Swiss-Prot record:
<keyword id="KW-1017">Isopeptide bond</keyword>
<dbReference type="GO" id="GO:0000422">
    <property type="term" value="P:autophagy of mitochondrion"/>
</dbReference>
<dbReference type="GO" id="GO:0034045">
    <property type="term" value="C:phagophore assembly site membrane"/>
</dbReference>
<comment type="function">
    <text>Ubiquitin-like protein involved in cytoplasm to vacuole transport (Cvt), autophagy vesicles formation, mitophagy, and nucleophagy. Conjugation with ATG5 through a ubiquitin-like conjugating system involving also ATG7 as an E1-like activating enzyme and ATG10 as an E2-like conjugating enzyme, is essential for its function. The ATG12-ATG5 conjugate functions as an E3-like enzyme which is required for lipidation of ATG8 and ATG8 association to the vesicle membranes.</text>
</comment>
<dbReference type="GO" id="GO:0000421">
    <property type="term" value="C:autophagosome membrane"/>
</dbReference>
<dbReference type="GO" id="GO:0034274">
    <property type="term" value="C:Atg12-Atg5-Atg16 complex"/>
</dbReference>
<comment type="similarity">
    <text>Belongs to the ATG12 family.</text>
</comment>
<feature type="cross-link" description="Glycyl lysine isopeptide (Gly-Lys) (interchain with K-135 in ATG5)">
    <location>
        <position position="167"/>
    </location>
</feature>
<dbReference type="GO" id="GO:0000045">
    <property type="term" value="P:autophagosome assembly"/>
</dbReference>
<protein>
    <recommendedName>
        <fullName>Ubiquitin-like protein ATG12</fullName>
    </recommendedName>
</protein>
<dbReference type="InterPro" id="IPR029071">
    <property type="entry name" value="Ubiquitin-like_domsf"/>
</dbReference>
<keyword id="KW-0833">Ubl conjugation pathway</keyword>
<keyword id="KW-0813">Transport</keyword>
<dbReference type="InterPro" id="IPR007242">
    <property type="entry name" value="Atg12"/>
</dbReference>
<dbReference type="GO" id="GO:0061723">
    <property type="term" value="P:glycophagy"/>
</dbReference>
<dbReference type="GO" id="GO:0019776">
    <property type="term" value="F:Atg8-family ligase activity"/>
</dbReference>
<keyword id="KW-0072">Autophagy</keyword>
Amino acid sequence: MSDKDLASSLMELNIKVGTTDIPQTIAEEQNQVTDTKEEVLDDETTIKNDPQKTKITLNQSMMLSKLPAKTTSAVLSVSKPTESKIQIRFKSIGSVDQVSPAVFKISKSSKFSSILRFLELKLGKKVYCYLNNSVSPNPDEELENLYNIFRVGDELIVSYCNIVAFG
């Protein structure tokens, strides 16, 4: 058996057994040793260089105090916390019973189908819903988008009835 045949059969054995991470040359072996040292050094340096997270208000920030007035107002308006819930007011149309209480809060990320299900469970019958007595939204629409477009004041008005009322 020649050296080439022996080397190829050893390579096949390594592939079959799954020990392909054995270094084939001295250079590969040296690279593996240096890689492990770099990993240890990287772990130590990231621990040492990891900054401590502190909460500094926008009014206390040195960088923001030196910004122009327009930029500061833009940053402050963007950084205000947003509400995660929106207010929904239900209004009945026709002979359908009024849901009580008429005002609810729901998550912005919810779909309009959750309102349909809620009303159908509360009333015990199928309902047709409209926003501002004009638009019947798709059940897959997110409430946040509908709220941004159709809100009146600080609430979304959802009218409902048991028959098709508009259009």
